[in-house]
Amino acid sequence: MVRESVLVMVGGALGSLARYWVGLGISQWAGAPPFLFGTLLVNLVGSFMLGGLFAWSVALRIDPALLLLAGTGFCGGFTTFSALSIECLVLLQKGDYPTAMGYLLGSLLGGLAAGWAGYLAAKAL
C-alpha cells in the first residue's frame, strides 16, 4: 500500500509539473493566460496517453505499478477536470454561452477521440 501510494504521488507530481510547464509555454507562445487552450491541450494529450497506456496494459500485461505511476499518477496529475469546470462556469457567468458549450463539447468529444486514437496507436505498435 505504501509503495503504490508513493508511485501515485510521484506520478501525480510529475504530471502536475508537466501541466504547469504546458501552461507556461502556452502563455509565452500566445502572450496570454493559458485559459481554455492550455486546459484543452493537456486534457486531449492526457486522454491520448491514457488510451495508449490502456491498450498496452491489455496487450503487454504491464506491471500494475507502472499503471499506477503513469496512469493514475502522471495522467491524473497532468489532466484537469476541475479547471475545465471552472473555465466553463466563468464563460457562462460572462454570458458567453456559445464558447462555453463549444469548449465543453470539444473537450468531451475531443477527449474521447484522443483516448481512442491513443488506444489505436498503441495497438498498432
Swiss-Prot record:
GO biological process, one term: cellular detoxification of fluoride
Record membrane topology: Multi-pass membrane protein
Subcellular location: Cell inner membrane
Xref: Pfam families: CRCB
Gene Ontology MF, one: fluoride channel activity
Record-annotated membrane-spanning stretches: 6-26, 35-55, 66-86, 100-120
Main function: Fluoride-specific ion channel. Important for reducing fluoride concentration in the cell, thus reducing its toxicity.
Family: Belongs to the fluoride channel Fluc/FEX (TC 1.A.43) family.
UniProt protein name: Fluoride-specific ion channel FluC
Gene: fluC
